[in-house]
Amino acid sequence: MLRVKCLNNIITTCKCLYSSTVTVQQINEEVAKLLELKAQLGDGGDAQQKFILKTPKGTRDYSPEQMALRLGVLDKIINVFKRHGAETIDTPIFELKEVLTGKYGEDTKLIYDLKDQGGEILALRYDLTVPFARYLAMSKITNIKRYHIAKVYRRDNPSMTKGRYREFYQCDFDIAGIYDSMLPDAECLRIVVESLSALNLGAFVIKVNHRSLLDGIFAACGVPNDKFRTICSSVDKLDKSPWEEVRKEMVEEKQLDEAIADKIGSYVSKRGDVKLVNELREDEILMKQPKAKEGLEAMELLLKYCDIYRVTDKVVFDLSLARGLDYYTGVIYEAVITDSEVGSVAGGGRYDNLVGMFDPKKKNVPCVGVSIGVERIFSVLENQIASQGGKIRTTEVQVFVASAQKNLHDERMRILVDLWDAEIKAEQSYKKNPKILAQLQHCEENGIPLAIIIGEGELAKGVVTLREVNTRVERTVPRDKLVEEVKKWLGN
């Protein structure tokens, strides 16, 4: 009814304003009426009913089960980072837009812009690498081994079933500083192997390539210098699109000569190990390109170090790997789960010139790093758990303090204090007189391994009952030795 009334009023107002004899005062009065109608419509019940309560596109909430899985994954990855001597930092969730632009190639269009009343032009961070480079330049840091886990934002078309979102966590490890060739790069590959192996994701492979080698290939094929980066962005799509589609984009959208595109196709189809390095060295046309020589020498050394680090079985030299971000300057790599459709679960490479873009004196700090795609990893693990019918514990409670009779809640609380003081994770029911079956059922449903059961008779004798929840085996222990006995049981 409100909308019908408003519509009639709008028609009346329009007739009045259309009149050739309308005065300024009448116009002001009718405008005031329209504003009042707008306010009424905004507060109307119909408008509220049409509001759909949901999260924005490309985002999601996380349940306790999902958060438990997430924290478990991050804990394992952080342990790997710390094992390799990394320290952690944090940076703002948004940056000056100028800091981010010109660093991501064609993906710059995916940056979220912000409006700021203070006059600064801002944007949500697209990744953690560019803010890290900005941090190094601002702080005058020339060497650091750091990890950073935080949310980033991309205005992408998400596919949440495949672990792709607009808001998601990145998990980065980077080594900054002037060091001997390929030593930090090889360690980054070792870190990827350790991390993915610790998570039991199944079989995976790490594809590696070198930006200098790619540039040498483009030059040998006849790609104009000013098209190197845009053609590189096309090659980067080969992990998602067949060669025919990529070739079509090169020729039709980027006006690359068909013969040149075909030459590129003959190279990017190659993959192998150190034997591929030797095969490419026999390519006379390619070896005339200094960039190609430089890239092959680096790849040979990297593969040697991979052998020493015992990761050769996980690494494949793949000429189709491009990684479209503009800031990469050397080795690049990407990890893929072989029996999953989620795409890459880790990627990175060397970016020696990024810090210099922010330094007033253009002083570069060589960097190499890896970003582990934890959102996609969560997606893989959630699917694994669902297919196996598994259940995730959402708490770390070790002991539940239960009572078998009424009016024992004070003693339950005293026992809890003793356990908490001993740094044992414990809880009780928040009812004064809970039923014993309900308490034990709570333990079983939540995976709590041990229950302490108290009763009037046992307390009078100075003992309590310890119950192993899984086996339902019970034994009595002295009340004054309870904490000691619980610690002993948990230790075993």
Which residues are covered by each model-predicted region?
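Phosphate-rich ligand and nucleic-acid binding surfaces
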Residues: 61, 105, 216-226, 237, ...
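Generic recognition of cysteine residues
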Residues: 6, 14-16, 171, 188, ...
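Short amphipathic alpha-helical segments that mediate assembly, nucleic-acid/protein binding
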Residues: 3, 7, 27, 228, ...
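Glycine-rich, mobile lid/loop segments that gate access to catalytic sites or pores
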Residues: 206-217
